[in-house]
A protein has these predicted regions:
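The beta1-alpha1 cofactor-binding region of Rossmann-like NAD(H)/NADP(H)-dependent oxidoreductases
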Residues: 66-78, 117, 227-228
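Short C-terminal tail/terminal secondary-structure segment
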Residues: 2-4, 160, 234, 245-262
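Short, small/polar-rich loop/turn modules that mediate ligand/substrate recognition or access, typified
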Residues: 188, 193, 244-246
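Canonical Rossmann dinucleotide-binding motif of NAD(H)/NADP(H)-dependent dehydrogenases/reductases
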Residues: 7-40
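Catalytic Tyr-X3-Lys loop
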Residues: 98, 112-132, 147, 151, ...
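A short, exposed helix-loop element centered on a Lys and neighboring polar residues
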Residues: 135-136, 181
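Catalytic loop of short-chain dehydrogenase/reductase
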Residues: 21, 117, 149-175, 180-189
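Conserved mid-core segment of classical short-chain dehydrogenase/reductases
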Residues: 99-121, 164-168, 206-208, 261
Length: 262
C-alpha cells in the first residue's frame, strides 16, 4: 500500500522528453505511474508510443504523445491533449531537451567564441523555451484546481558547476532553475510547487565514454542510474513535498562538493 504522503492515485502527469528507453524521462514516468498517477509521456518522435506501450503492458495508465516543444503552440496543444484525455493535469515534469555531450563542437557544445548564434538559440529553445512553454500552458489548469507540481530537469552543469565548451547548455540549464524559482514564488499561494532536479553523470544510452569515465571519479565511483534521478523527481511531485518549492535538488553522488579527486 502506498503511504498517503506519496500516493498519486487520481492525479494526472505529463512527462516530456520521455522517448528514450534508458533516459530520465521514461524513468520518471514509470516512477509516477508506480505511485498511482495516470501519465502522458511525450517526445519528438513516434518511439514515445513504444514507451507508452511498455508502461501500459506493465499495468499502468499511460498514453503517448508527439510534440516539438520548441514551438509554443505545440506545447499548448500537448497540454490540451493531456487535459482532454485525463480531464485533469496535476503534474508536469519538464525533461525535454538536449543532454550535454561533453565534447566541443557537438550538439550545443562550444565556448562563446566557437558557438554561433543559431546554435545558441537552438540550445535555449530545446532546454529552456520548451520548459517555459509547457509550464505556462499548464499553470492555469493547476491554479484552477488549487494543486500542482512542476519539476524542471536541469543539470549540475550551469546551476552548480561549469564544464568547458558548454556555454549554451550551461546557460539554458541555469535558466531552468531560475525559472523554477520565479514560478515557485509567483504561484505558491495557488497550491502549486515548482522545483528543479540537477543530475550529474547519468548512465543512460547516450552516455559517452568520457562521461562514463567522469562518473567513476565521483565520490561514489559510478554514474547515477536514471531511476535514481527519477526517485527525486517523483518525490517532488507527491503530497509529502507540499512545502518544498523553489528548490534545486542535486543528484550527483556528492561530485559537486568533493574537493579532491582520487
Amino acid at each position: 500500500m502506498i503511504p498517503a504522503s506519496l500516493d498519486l492515485a487520481g492525479r494526472a502527469a505529463l512527462v516530456t522528453g520521455a522517448g528514450s528507453e534508458s533516459g530520465i524521462g521514461f524513468a520518471a514516468a514509470r516512477a509516477l505511474a508506480e505511485l498511482g498517477a495516470s501519465v502522458t509521456v511525450a517526445a519528438t518522435t513516434d518511439r514515445v508510443h513504444e514507451r507508452a506501450a511498455a508502461l501500459a503492458g506493465a499495468g499502468y495508465t499511460v498514453q503517448g504523445a508527439i510534440a516539438d516543444l520548441t514551438d509554443d503552440g505545440a506545447a499548448e496543444g500537448l497540454v490540451r491533449a493531456a487535459l482532454g484525455h485525463w480531464d485533469r493535469l496535476d503534474i508536469v515534469v519538464n525533461n525535454a531537451g538536449m543532454t550535454s555531450v561533453s565534447l566541443p563542437g557537438a550538439a550545443e557544445g562550444g565556448d562563446a567564441l566557437s558557438l554561433d548564434a543559431e546554435a545558441w538559440r537552438a540550445s535555449m529553445a530545446r532546454n529552456l523555451d520548451s520548459a517555459y512553454y509547457v509550464s505556462r500552458a499548464a499553470l492555469p489548469v493547476m491554479r484552477e484546481s488549487g494543486w500542482g507540481r512542476i519539476v524542471m530537469v536541469a543539470s549540475v552543469t550551469g546551476p552548480v558547476m561549469a564544464m568547458r565548451a558548454e556555454s549554451a547548455y550551461a546557460a539554458a540549464k541555469a535558466g531552468m532553475v531560475g525559472l523554477a524559482r520565479s514560478l515557485a514564488v509567483d504561484f505558491a499561494a495557488d497550491g502549486i510547487t515548482v522545483n528543479a532536479v540537477a543530475p550529474g553523470w547519468i548512465a543512460t544510452g547516450s552516455q559517452t565514454d568520457h562521461e562514463r569515465e567522469q562518473g567513476l571519479r565521483t565520490p561514489m565511483r559510478r554514474s547515477a542510474t536514471a531511476d535514481e534521478v527519477a526517485s527525486a523527481i517523483a518525490w517532488l511531485c507527491t503530497p509529502g513535498a507540499a512545502y518544498t518549492t523553489g528548490q534545486c535538488i542535486v543528484v550527483d553522488g556528492g561530485n559537486s562538493i568533493a574537493e579532491e579527486r582520487a
